[in-house]
Amino acid sequence: MAKNKFSKDWIHQHINDPYVKLAQQKGYRARAAFKLLEILDAEKLMRRGDIVVDLGSAPGSWSQVARERLAGPGGAVDGRIIALDLLPMEPVAGVEFIQGDFREEAVLEQLARMVEGQPVDLVISDMAPNLSGVGVADSARIQHVCELALEFACAHLKPNGALIVKAFHGSGFSQIVQSYKQRFKRVVERKPKASRDKSSETFLVARDLK
């Protein structure tokens, strides 16, 4: 009964969520688009000519935002957008997509080859591991995903590049922040308005490699 009540509550909340309705109106595939938009506006990030890598891209709302931000006068992408996800993603015009597991070395190598010789301006990561409900195990998974995004960004970003990554408050969060501060000159936390109040998610914005 409790599970059914939870499901009904979630459905009710989802249907009445203003960001869900706004996403439908604007053609975004998910309400998460508004999280990224708020962060980009606050940080004045992503502009024409940028090379952007979108990690954990499915269903594609962040890639859609990048596509809009990088659109030139004729509508074509002015820059480059490379997206990656374990799940399939419906094509977004002008976005190059890799389907694969970011934790696998072969997939990382494929992504690295695609950006070889082209330093990246911005890495955006909405990746989240499958959570088990076991605190210690989940914290380790979250930390691992954040560390993978960090290592990729440090290897491929321009010196003045930036990384936006989803994390979760809880055990291990302070270690994630500390590891980011060791590699970047500026690291801030942002909780966009589109993030649900009950969610422990937060976004780290790391800028300027040390």
UniProtKB/Swiss-Prot annotation:
GO molecular function: rRNA (uridine-2'-O-)-methyltransferase activity
Catalyzed reactions per annotation: uridine(2552) in 23S rRNA + S-adenosyl-L-methionine = 2'-O-methyluridine(2552) in 23S rRNA + S-adenosyl-L-homocysteine + H(+)
Matching CDD domains: AdoMet_MTases (cd02440)
Enzyme class: transferase
InterPro entries membership: RNA_methyltr_RlmE, RNA_MeTrfase_FtsJ_dom, rRNA-MeTfrase_E, SAM-dependent_MTases_sf
Active site, per annotation: K166
Oxidoreductase found in the keyword field: no
Name the record gives this protein: Ribosomal RNA large subunit methyltransferase E
Lineage, uppermost ranks: Bacteria, Pseudomonadati, Pseudomonadota, Betaproteobacteria, Burkholderiales
